[in-house]
Amino acid sequence: MICLGIESTAHTFGCGIIDSKGKTYANVTDAYKTEHGGIHPSEAKKHHENAKDKVVEDALKNANLKLEDIGLISFSQGPGLAPCLLVGLKKATELSKKINVPLIILLPDYNIYELIEHC
């Protein structure tokens, strides 16, 4: 089974695609950068909203896969910045509904390979 995962906990919006055997098909990221200081949550959210579609498209393209090839969607629940996490949740939910596949939450100590092996 092939899993598409979304990471959006803070300054980076990322999309990774893996299978249950441990093969990585793609890992595409786009990072929010500030000129001064740390992360501004509302600005990071805007960045993620602007980057999300291209990041997912690029990951699928790099993996030479179509969205319909995906059997499971996952996303990071946290810890992280709530505005950023919500962008990832919404994108993951949108994709899951579009192709009618399960949506799972990833927590920091989950082993995704074990999870998709049992789906």
Locations of the language-model features?
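Short acidic/glycine-rich loops and adjacent helix/strand connectors
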Residues: 1-119
